[in-house]
Amino acid sequence: MANSPHGGVLKDLLARDAPRHDQLAAEAESLPAIVLSERQLCDLELIMNGGFSPLEGFMNQKDFDGVCENCRLADGNLFSMPITLDASQQVINELKLQAGSRVTLRDFRDDRNLAILTIDDIYRADKEKEAKLVFGGDPEHPAIKYLNTKVEEFYIGGKIEAVNKLNHYDYVALRYTPAELRIHFDKLGWSRVVAFQTRNPMHRAHRELTVRAARARAANVLIHPVVGLTKPGDIDHFTRVRAYQALLPRYPNGMAVLGLLGLAMRMGGPREAIWHAIIRKNHGATHFIVGRDHAGPGKNSKGEEFYGPYDAQHAVEKYKDELGIEVVEFQQVTYLPDTDEYKPKDEVPAGVKTLDISGTELRNRLRTGAHIPEWFSYPEVVKILRESSPPRHTQGFTVFLTGYQNSGKDAIARALQVTLNQQGGRAVSLLLGDTVRHELSSELGFSREDRHTNIQRIAFVASELTKAGAAVIAAPIAPYEHSRKAAREAVSQHGSFFLVHVNTPLEYCEKTDKRGIYAKARAGEIKGFTGVDDPYEAPENAHLTVDVSKQSVRSIVHEIILLLETEGFFDRA
């Protein structure tokens, strides 16, 4: 029999509200609507299907304060992660929202009404408290960055009535709700289930440690990877799920089940580990594997870990009795080539030869096409990873040139385009500043906000082309550091981004200006002109800095080509 839900009752709102579906659906059409973001959709789905039991909606201020301050909901139940619905003052005013109002929650992807929220309260988001108490306070933490850059200024708390479940078009058969997974366990006759959380591909070591954990507890294995929002730069979930499916037959027959979890991770370390344990308990698991630095975001810019290596294990252990799910501490296993087996590192005698491949080394081997041995991963898994991680010389990239008007960006960009076309091997796309302004951003002006929007449009196009394997050359002025950083982040999700600062002096740009644009700006005929009455913020971390007043275009292009060659973007075979 599956484990009892957290709080005693599985809050399956979809099942609870199904008899009133037609009535709720009609009402939802008549109410004002909040269109949910991707993260909000992930949260709503797990509220509605009971994955976040005992929650029945988004947290009001009492619940939010209790969770932030002591991991407690207002009713005393343990819960470690704030689950909140943020909204701007503008949305609240436009929809005339207040305590007691009912509002529809709508899916941005297909405009479907998913739920009705009865508002309990609207309160200012205490981002400082949330950042410090929940995530540790480091401004470089991805969850804190999200708080400070994406989350609106108010939270709306209240209970949910479910109207429709979210539509999914990928791996539908593997997206078990908690109730469905519990039924599946009962059908299989499983009473002890070890859940394994991951956001990465699984290899031989993962298979070994999950089998060992199950064997020691006379249990079965639930492979329960996150396929919602994970850490930027992670391997996409489509690739990962294909790899999990390929791995599954390597388990003893009938030992393991694969189920997908549409969770939006916060990378919250200890707090997140408790949250993950609650979620797995709600899905029926009796045991949960917690690893070293579980759900940690890695290191900050100083090379420091955000959390201690065993903080997550200690946090879950602290609440183990209340959680009602047994913690299985992740054992670091290593390969012994002499006996062709994996063993926990603390069981290997001194002097015995061991082999390991780090995550960084694996990525390097995938990038370069180097051999990945069968002792590390199964051939069928490696094949899938190689299909989604082609060698560097076939991958797309973006070269982003920034500098003053008439600094030589366009000349460099055109010459680089010709050189890359001559090189061959990939399509080459050119995004010149004037061209983009004419074709994509003709309605935008030159305010700081409009300039930022223009750069984000360039970044979006560049990221899509890069993802498709093209070489992209972008050459806008891009005067603001925050815009360039946002562009780098957007493109880097799909490929490499190289920032080239064309640091030609303003005086030279103005002196050689044959179009007379600087003269018009000096005369006041053009307002907000970069270098005249609007600042240019020099890049903090350019890959190359060049100067057309001191270098030829040919030599600058050669520098860029050498950079690309050094990074492996040309076939060396």
Curated annotation (Swiss-Prot):
ATP binds at residues 197-200, 291-294, 333. Allosterically inhibited by 3'-phosphoadenosine 5'-phosphosulfate (PAPS). Coiled coil: none annotated. Its main location: cytoplasm. Pfam families: APS_kinase, ATP-sulfurylase, PUA_2. It is an enzyme of class 2 (transferase). CDD domains: APSK (cd02027), ATPS (cd00517). Residues 395-573 are annotated as: Allosteric regulation domain. Sulfate binds at residues 197, 199, 295. The keyword Signal does not apply. GO terms for cellular component: cytoplasm. It catalyses: sulfate + ATP + H(+) = adenosine 5'-phosphosulfate + diphosphate. HAMAP family: Sulf_adenylyltr_euk. Homohexamer. Dimer of trimers. Catalyzes the first intracellular reaction of sulfate assimilation, forming adenosine-5'-phosphosulfate (APS) from inorganic sulfate and ATP. Plays an important role in sulfate activation as a component of the biosynthesis pathway of sulfur-containing amino acids. In the N-terminal section; belongs to the sulfate adenylyltransferase family. In the C-terminal section; belongs to the APS kinase family. This is Sulfate adenylyltransferase. The gene is met3.
